[in-house]
Amino acid sequence: MTAPADESNAHETVPLQNGSDLKEKRNGSSPYHMLSTYLSFPTREQEQWWSQTGPVLGRMLEASGYALDQQFQYLTLHYNQIVPRLGPYPPNFRSNLTVSGLLIEFSINYQQKGTNHPTVRLGVEPTDSFSGTERDPLNKVPLRAALNQFERIGVKGFDSQLYTYFEPKHALTREEQLRVATEIPGGDKRSTQGALAFNLEDSGINMKGYTYPGIKAHLAHVEVRSMITEAIKDLKSQGKGDWVEAWAKTADYVTEINGWGFHNLWGWDYVDPSLSRFKFYTWQFDVPDMTKLGELFTLNNRATSPTHLEGLTYLHKLWDIIDLKGSGKRELPADASQPPENTNPMLLSYEIKSGNPLPYAKVYFPLQGFNDLACVEKIARFWEHLGWKGLAESYPATVQSFFPNHDLSKTSHLVYWLSFSYSEKQGVYSSVYYHANAEI
């Protein structure tokens, strides 16, 4: 087991630019403002989505060290491919993708190895004016239309085979959609069938897909485990890849912790199936201590490679710093589920790759409802522990610059999640998830 890195041996990422640098750029000619001067919009709603989310994305790209041409490239992607798929403004369809119900979220990923700067990411549930109506009650049509468009424009490496495979297995039929409200607890709030995510990398976009198999399984009177196990074995029989052993370990442990349910999320990469990861998400309502978290991270000793154990040392430090139990009561919207004080609810995902018998865990600390500045300062402490001194020093001011009209010391809805995973290739792999439109 290797001890956590200190400043002398840590892998230093490119630090975020500080808030004052960004303010100067915004007062001048930032890519967002230069584009906005000449862009036209077919509807007022698209213009509003652009004016509310575009500046946040632009600031994140600047702060994360993207070259100027890349900033223009990804803002143009946002204008052309994301904004037209966000539907009415303000939105009238609530997504299960985000805590706020917003159809879009931004995140920034940091890793010890393998990248020159942090990576900005987008998550989105495509929608339109028919979403949530009797014409498309659970918003199935816009996702399919979005994928068709990305296939047409020739995104490098894009492959929709896994969507074509999983969509009919996990998405609800018309008849099943009509049964959700009466047969699923809280069914009127379980509206999302699928979502997209984009990593904005130097080499281009890397796309990921998500579905919610739990509702389909319940309505079809089958278990989530058997539904996914059958699919994994079928893909192997087709010669698409072999995830069988890693999935069996994952499924056994999820059964052990009673982690099957409506909340389960399933994810893949939009690449050739043999190259894709699969991700399975589950939820624990209270993780009382680091011993339990260590069990979750290693699937109760089903995955204890040197890499897993090294990651566990970093996770232990992060647990101590974030201290969910000692953070008090969350300030959440009245209609949101309020976790009891002094509990540690956690989201987890288990990632499996073809040919690798071991799953790898990712832990998500839910920060929504806690003071944003306090959360950001805790995250900065973890960056400092990793030896990312420049990033740690600039981080609070930079996050404040993402939301210039809000005082982080007085808000509790702008920072959603902090995730942590660890691999031999990337080292610490951690992402912070943010509200994409602080005005909603």
For the regions a protein language model found, what residue spans apply to each?
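Compact beta-rich and alpha/beta scaffold cores in large eukaryotic transport/transcription complexes
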Residues: P142, E151-R152, A220-I440
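Long, solvent-exposed N-terminal ectodomains/accessory regions
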Residues: E12-E125
